[in-house]
Amino acid sequence: MVNEQIIDISGPLKGEIEVPGDKSMTHRAIMLASLAEGVSTIYKPLLGEDCRRTMDIFRLLGVEIKEDDEKLVVTSPGYQSFNTPHQVLYTGNSGTTTRLLAGLLSGLGIESVLSGDVSIGKRPMDRVLRPLKLMDANIEGIEDNYTPLIIKPSVIKGINYQMEVASAQVKSAILFASLFSKEPTIIKELDVSRNHTETMFKHFNIPIEAEGLSINTTPEAIRYIKPADFHVPGDISSAAFFIVAALITPGSDVTIHNVGINPTRSGIIDIVEKMGGNIQLFNQTTGAEPTASIRIQYTPMLQPITIEGELVPKAIDELPVIALLCTQAVGTSTIKDAEELKVKETNRIDTTADMLNLLGFELQPTNDGLIIYPSEFKTNATVDSLTDHRIGMMLAVASLLSSEPVKIKQFDAVNVSFPGFLPKLKLLENEG
């Protein structure tokens, strides 16, 4: 990774932008389009490094995926005609690719090996392996917990599973495996987690029932799959950096168009509203994956907040930049119930606190979250993304609170989810 990026951006931020397509939905659209025999077109996909790993794996399985002017054209022979890969399936830095394909390839019964980069090699896989083994998947990891994951053919059975954590990746791994079982699967969630797999199964004609915290699948549901075109909304996790940047930078007025506001993902909007932030939604669309334009204006005197319970999974990927936002509130804020942050690209509880504390902010990590005190940017230490894309972008937003440039090591980690992040931030500076 490039060693160092100097961030020298000052406010106010003004203008109108779009953010890249939603990462979660792009992954799932590629997977489902690849399973369905025929041609599917995916419009405005995210073509960051994570989603490219998913594309490359399906190309090895025999799917043709063409990139053409902000769209992907996926031409698939259908899941029954997939090749057996003769090389390791490399998932890079992508936890979504690794965990969802663990379920999908187990269901398909394709002999394969999934392995990622050094960061993925440290991330626990037992939470996925346990339910898959209950489904009779023949899948093994190092110490039953780490990549590489070795998958061999087996006959998947349906299960009745009580989720141990509120994790969309674990839920989705089970759902993808269940497509191939002769029995129904019932999943009971602890809290509502992002439901893109469920909404997109329906979009590709796969029957699934979800009510409250219960999800029921249909036996051998894969036989119903049909190719479909899909328009990917802008990623609210990417929009979050601009939402916070506008809220904390005096004089700012930013509008972000075509952002996905699925209610299982829109926790940051709820949090900003509770803090008294100046945020407005308009141009709203309805449907399985609703969208809106979001206007954000600088807001002094933000109110402190406690983020806990069902709000946490709705904002899990945004919590590092939300923690930065909370430093600008008029009182102490708390994030609880966020143990899931420990198993992201880094332990985001620790990395968020460590990097922001280096810059003079005051955050105290806890076992399941953070205590965040009203505090200011005080010192121009060199900070480090630690190869975590969301930490890198959060630190770039923090630099707006400094009058001096800020150096961030390993900044090109942001390309995982947001190629072109820095030029877009500079565009708003120039318009301001």
UniProtKB/Swiss-Prot annotation:
Keywords: Amino-acid biosynthesis, Aromatic amino acid biosynthesis, Cytoplasm, Transferase. SUPFAM superfamilies: EPT/RTPC-like. It catalyses: 3-phosphoshikimate + phosphoenolpyruvate = 5-O-(1-carboxyvinyl)-3-phosphoshikimate + phosphate. Coiled coil: none annotated. Its EC number is 2.5.1.19. GO terms for molecular function: 3-phosphoshikimate 1-carboxyvinyltransferase activity. Pathway: Metabolic intermediate biosynthesis; chorismate biosynthesis; chorismate from D-erythrose 4-phosphate and phosphoenolpyruvate: step 6/7. GO terms for cellular component: cytoplasm. PANTHER family: AROM/DEHYDROQUINATE SYNTHASE (PTHR21090), PENTAFUNCTIONAL AROM POLYPEPTIDE (PTHR21090:SF5). NCBIfam families: aroA (TIGR01356). Belongs to the EPSP synthase family. HAMAP family: EPSP_synth. This is 3-phosphoshikimate 1-carboxyvinyltransferase. It comes from Staphylococcus aureus (strain COL). The gene is aroA.
